[in-house]
């Protein structure tokens, strides 16, 4: 069952799973990230650390999106209000570039 909270996440191409967090608690999850409390904790800590960086004075939120790229997948993190949306996406293979 798709809720208003997750309907957009389920339509993301190459999506392998998602987490929706609020204050470190998992509100919704699916796929590879379903009920993954360890990932939720690590991502919450990462977001907290990233929020500590202030490149420009006066910014309310220091970032909107954060990408953590691994070999075969990427974690895409978006902060919206009090919620953190995390999507695990499959990285698409690329053809080698001839130089």
From Swiss-Prot:
GO terms for biological process: cellular response to amino acid stimulus; positive regulation of TOR signaling; positive regulation of TORC1 signaling; protein localization to lysosome; regulation of cell size; TORC1 signaling. It is found in: Lysosome. Transmembrane segments: none annotated. It comes from the Eukaryota. Its main location: other. Keywords: Acetylation, Lysosome, Phosphoprotein. The modification N-acetylmethionine is found at residue 1. The modification Phosphoserine is found at residue 67. Phosphorylation at Ser-67 by PKA inhibits Ragulator complex assembly. The modification N-acetylthreonine is found at residue 2. The keyword Nucleus does not apply. GO terms for cellular component: FNIP-folliculin RagC/D GAP; intracellular membrane-bounded organelle; late endosome membrane; lysosomal membrane; lysosome; Ragulator complex. As part of the Ragulator complex it is involved in amino acid sensing and activation of mTORC1, a signaling complex promoting cell growth in response to growth factors, energy levels, and amino acids. Activated by amino acids through a mechanism involving the lysosomal V-ATPase, the Ragulator plays a dual role for the small GTPases Rag (RagA/RRAGA, RagB/RRAGB, RagC/RRAGC and/or RagD/RRAGD): it (1) acts as a guanine nucleotide exchange factor (GEF), activating the small GTPases Rag and (2) mediates recruitment of Rag GTPases to the lysosome membrane. Part of the Ragulator complex composed of LAMTOR1, LAMTOR2, LAMTOR3, LAMTOR4 and LAMTOR5. LAMTOR4 and LAMTOR5 form a heterodimer that interacts, through LAMTOR1, with a LAMTOR2, LAMTOR3 heterodimer. The Ragulator complex interacts with both the mTORC1 complex and heterodimers constituted of the Rag GTPases RagA/RRAGA, RagB/RRAGB, RagC/RRAGC and RagD/RRAGD; regulated by amino acid availability. The Ragulator complex interacts with SLC38A9; the probable amino acid sensor. Belongs to the LAMTOR4 family. This is Ragulator complex protein LAMTOR4. It comes from Homo sapiens. The gene is LAMTOR4.
């Amino acid at each position: 069952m798709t809720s208003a909270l997750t309907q957009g996440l389920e339509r993301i191409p190459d999506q392998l799973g998602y987490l929706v967090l609020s204050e470190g608690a998992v509100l919704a999850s699916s796929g590879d990230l379903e009920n993954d409390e360890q990932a939720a904790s690590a991502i919450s800590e990462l977001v907290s650390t990233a929020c500590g960086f202030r490149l420009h004075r006066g910014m309310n939120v220091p970032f909107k999106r954060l990408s953590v790229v691994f070999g075969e997948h990427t974690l895409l993190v978006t902060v919206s209000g009090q919620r953190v949306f995390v999507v695990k996406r499959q990285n698409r293979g690329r053809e080698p570039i001839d130089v």
